[in-house]
From Swiss-Prot:
GO terms for molecular function: RNA binding. This is Non-structural protein 3. One of its GO terms (biological process) is regulation of translation. It comes from the Viruses. Keywords: Coiled coil, Host cytoplasm, RNA-binding, Translation regulation. InterPro entries: dsRBD_dom, NSP3_N_rotavirus, NSP3_sf, Rotavirus_NSP3. Residues 334-402 form the DRBM domain. Belongs to the rotavirus NSP3 family.
Length: 402
């Protein structure tokens, strides 16, 4: 089929190239654009009739079918019941193929364009302006045989999330070339978190997408409005769809939701999920070292297994580390840290700050901050380093009379 498709493409390109050349010649000679369009339209109709009536089209397609059959099984390469391919036939086909390549080259269709067209196709998803590049069977076969190497061009101006997706693509290609099972190691992390009792869908989706992207995702603008606002229909499935609409680099091949036909199979093997708890709360759960953990509105704790999966990640994603952000502010209040830093600078005070980590009774991680400023000492507990340090800073400011 590949040769037949190539021949069909050659005829289409030849007609288009000739039409464009004819239109340009008419305009260069002073003809109007309307006249050029009229002549080109008549030419293209005559061109199709000509290659059909002359038998050139059918002859070329017949030879293409012969080549395709010869590629699949030389014994099946029949032109008719009594005719089989032989060395002379192949020589003639090679010569004609070389002539066609020369013709394309003269029309401006260079080798790079011919090769790319034989291996890739471009489709567009309905309702979206972006394009999807698909591998043709010819390219897949060449990858399996080790004849095709895919390199991804890198740029220092790429965002961190895009660099991570490129590295992921390179890992997939490498595993595919070596015939190995594809595994992508991820760091579990949260995105930007907000605690107001209504943001669990945003929080859980932020953790899910941030983990896949490899970088914490920003969820709110300067006015504290959601960047991926879904209005009243707050559901992780709607939030992640909004992210894709906003061209966040997460793809349909990365996950499935509970409306997908193959959801059950994905759910069974997935290591990263968004789970609905009692149909009123959403958390991001993940498997780490054979135990299930979760980010519950930014708090890391052991997962108790309660809930129904809404979104599950591709099983190729595996968690090998947990990153706990020290910048998640769960209960901001007055900015004691800024005030304390001003005092330290103003009075030239020495500061000692260390952190310890413990597991709380419910399995969540609790930070302990030991803070000493001058002669004042205090400790603070919190679900993040920043929260623990802020609470210790409040105590220090009280001791210093500020």
């Amino acid at each position: 089929m590949a040769t037949q498709a190539s021949v069909e493409w050659i005829f289409n390109v030849a007609g288009s190239a000739a039409s464009a050349s004819l239109a340009k010649s008419i305009k260069d000679a002073g003809g109007s654009e309307d006249f050029a369009k009229y002549v080109v339209a008549r030419f293209y109709d005559n061109y199709k009739d000509s290659i059909d009536d002359s038998g050139i089209y059918n002859a070329c397609m017949g030879r293409a079918r012969t080549v395709d059959k010869a590629l699949n099984d030389s014994r099946l390469a029949e032109r008719n019941e009594e005719w089989h391919t032989n060395l002379a036939t192949i020589r003639r086909l090679d010569l004609e193929l070389a002539e066609l390549k020369l013709m394309l080259s003269n029309l401006g269709m260079k080798r790079e364009e011919r090769v790319l067209n034989s291996m890739f196709s471009v489709t567009r998803e309905e309702g979206r302006s972006s394009n999807v590049v698909m591998l043709k069977q010819n390219a897949v076969k060449m990858i399996e045989e080790g004849k095709l190497k895919i390199k991804v061009e890198k740029n220092e101006n790429y965002t961190e999330s895009l660099k991570n997706k490129i590295e992921e693509l390179e890992c997939i290609i490498g595993a595919f070339e070596k015939g190995k099972e594809i595994n992508i190691a991820l760091d579990a992390m949260t995105g930007e978190v907000r605690l107001d009792g209504d943001s669990c869908s945003y929080n859980s989706t932020a953790a899910f997408v941030s983990t896949i992207m490899g970088t914490p995702i920003k969820m709110y603008d300067e006015s504290n409005k959601p960047l991926f606002d879904v209005g009243k229909y707050i559901n992780p499935k709607h939030v992640i769809d909004k992210m894709i609409e906003s061209e966040i680099p997460i793809f349909k091949s990365d996950y499935r939701n509970n409306e997908s036909p193959d959801f059950d199979a994905w759910n069974e093997n997935s290591n990263l999920k968004i789970v609905s708890v009692n149909d009123c709360h959403a958390i991001c759960v993940f498997k780490f070292e054979n135990e299930w953990w979760c980010f519950d509105d930014g708090r890391l704790r052991k997962y108790n297994g309660i809930g129904n999966p809404l979104i599950v990640a591709n099983s190729k994603f595996q968690i090998d580390r947990i990153l706990i952000s020290g910048d998640i502010e769960l209960n901001p209040g007055p900015n004691a840290l800024v005030k304390l830093n001003d005092c330290i600078t103003k009075y030239n005070l020495k500061i000692i700050c260390t952190f310890d980590v413990n597991l709380d009774d419910d399995g969540s991680i609790m930070y302990i901050c030991y803070l000493k400023v001058g002669s004042a000492e205090a400790t603070g507990n919190g679900c993040s380093k920043k929260e623990a340090k802020r609470r210790a800073a409040v105590s220090i400011l009280d001791q210093l009379g500020m």
